């Protein structure tokens, strides 16, 4: 029985992918089975911010996650990929504030809190939908009915529950402390949201008069204090010297008069002071500097806050003791002339006033790092504010132990050290933010300022016996976005309820994330999860067993992708394509720095003169997997993307060759397996083993290489060719065997490839399954190929390997000698071992057809051979007589010309690379390209010289 199928000339990704995905989703193939008898496998997606669209980093990480989910689903595991989005407090509020400012010329205050939050929910509905659709285009096999948002009702309940319990345990407290304050966004931000920028500044040297007639060792009646922040002078509460600095030892415990404010402040000794910095005397301003804050605590200094939340000088100083309570016994009046001044205007005035008083010693240029808020984009101010904190040290101990004892493993392992360094030096976590968008802090205040924490106002009243006559107001602040994200693995599964999902899918198996949020998110998830989730024996549960840390995706030059550089590539543009005009509009529109638009447009036109061609999702996924070397950053390469699109086409064409073959015979008669049939089964079996080992160790790059190597170099380039003589001249039994092997290896290959390239494999599998006698609705629930000891066949692999080497050697001789493929050659073999002689006898006809040989002869040891081109294969010498095929002199002249040309190219590049100025100035990528060219030219030169010698010896 022969079978034949009609198949399109090429795979049309744009026509197939979305239709296939819709079919999968409608059929419910992505849902977990909830079969308790199966092993569970789950991944919680790092929730993308609801603020915008997916970028290459998302596409990269989600491709790896989906690969693992599909791989485990095909192994029969009960799989859950828990997806969702993050409310992203500051980022989302900023986006919507900018939107209403641009479109309506309004601020959030014009709307009021409730109406503004409604605006954000509208934005979330729009933006969240965009992200979900983009994730579908990537082929992500997510159970969309379980999609979550960090401010869903269920997750909000979990957040309140955690806050209340931690507060009851004394691990959440409210206190006045120094925080990073963003004066533009009016909120506290974490250290990790602060970007230190190099800046050319000044170091001002001010004279602080000594009080009560004191003098320095040199007889001066003042100390010179060096500072980079004159605007905070009014908040000084001490000056400090190093306790071992002999210049000032006699002055320790005495006082200076603070200029402008005219109050006495002490001279304290503290090892924090660097004797080499400035004069070795520094001013201490505990309310406006983190180091000074610590010095102030050590010396019990008052904290004088002279700035408003706008970073203007206050009308009246706020004076706080080291216990965080108001201090009424200390006086620090702000002079009238400074009140209400913007901070940098105040700086100028302070310097001018010191100068006019004769107290400005000198000004020095000084390089410094200025801390900026990464979202607000303005210098942050250390600010004394009332904030909520989590005391994390007790939580950190358990989390450190989990990694030390191997309950959680980092891949690559080096990231464990980064984790430990953060966790062993952990500070209390400021969890309150002065925003409107987010989880509102579940705390209420009465008119006397008493604080009540509870899950709701009703609970607070009931628990504390507060009737309706007691007025309560809820805390205005919201929680840090990372607080709710830290609960992600268990809150999405229904906690605090004890759901079947929580029992079945927690802990999750792996977290795939970037190194930049190991502390922001990973560490906090470990701490929170282990504190709240316990197994049946009361042992803390980890949120995940493995943390796979990815590198960054950079552009082809190794630059980080960013809007300001104009080098961002949208993953969907590589899938669907984009014309140049639209690409330019995307890269240069809505820029924070519009002056860069022209430069970006020029670079884009050079890189993508025709825009970006469509490549389809499978090609993008395969490229991302192939580039995923463990933990390393990836330099994006469009040529690799094109190459892997060609790979997908190769798989399609190979399938088309098999399924449209007129001679294909899958009838039930006798089958006589050829050497090639046994070989391809053994090779595929080995590929399955290597592929599975690679994925089990998160080596997506090695898995992709295995798949590519087998599909292109073994199945397509060799096995399909080796079957052609069988279909042309074989017996019925041999044709049936080749047909059976072709179809069955192809069907298994599609299953092997499915986790990486789901669309094309499903499309082909739907056509091949009937040929292979396989039942099932979809490839994604078919069993994943397993290694089979019975298919190991080292003998067949060795024999075909030798046959391939001989055929390749003959083909190389033909190409090197410019002999047309239509001309038959004779092959002489000398020193042929017995095993290879036997292989030759059994496969002589096949080898003659494949290498286009008229004859094959084994020479005796002492038998003379005519003038021939020779190659070695193992210990055997291959000789192809050249008489009548080439004109020796003409061929040598041609080769000599080619050799001279390459020598010239090598010298040119040697000159470039030997030029120190070029090497110093040229980008690394350009130098690497030149070295690569040099290697190619040198290898080419070697081959040409070898050809020259071969022909010269004829």
Curated annotation (Swiss-Prot):
It comes from the Bacteria. Keywords: Aminoacyl-tRNA synthetase, ATP-binding, Coiled coil, Cytoplasm, Ligase, Nucleotide-binding, Protein biosynthesis. Residues 886-954 form a coiled coil. Belongs to the class-I aminoacyl-tRNA synthetase family. ValS type 1 subfamily. Monomer. The lineage of its organism: Bacteria, Pseudomonadati, Pseudomonadota, Gammaproteobacteria, Pasteurellales. PROSITE patterns: AA_TRNA_LIGASE_I. GO terms for cellular component: cytosol. This is Valine--tRNA ligase. A motif ('HIGH' region) lies at residues 48-58. A motif ('KMSKS' region) lies at residues 560-564. Gene3D superfamilies: HUPs, Isoleucyl-tRNA Synthetase, Domain 1, Valyl-tRNA synthetase, C-terminal domain, Valyl/Leucyl/Isoleucyl-tRNA synthetase, editing domain. InterPro entries: aa-tRNA-synth_I_CS, aa-tRNA-synth_Ia, Anticodon_Ia_Val, M/V/L/I-tRNA-synth_anticd-bd, Rossmann-like_a/b/a_fold, tRNA-bd_arm, tRNAsynth_Ia_anticodon-bd, Val-tRNA_synth_C_sf. ValRS has two distinct active sites: one for aminoacylation and one for editing. The misactivated threonine is translocated from the active site to the editing site.
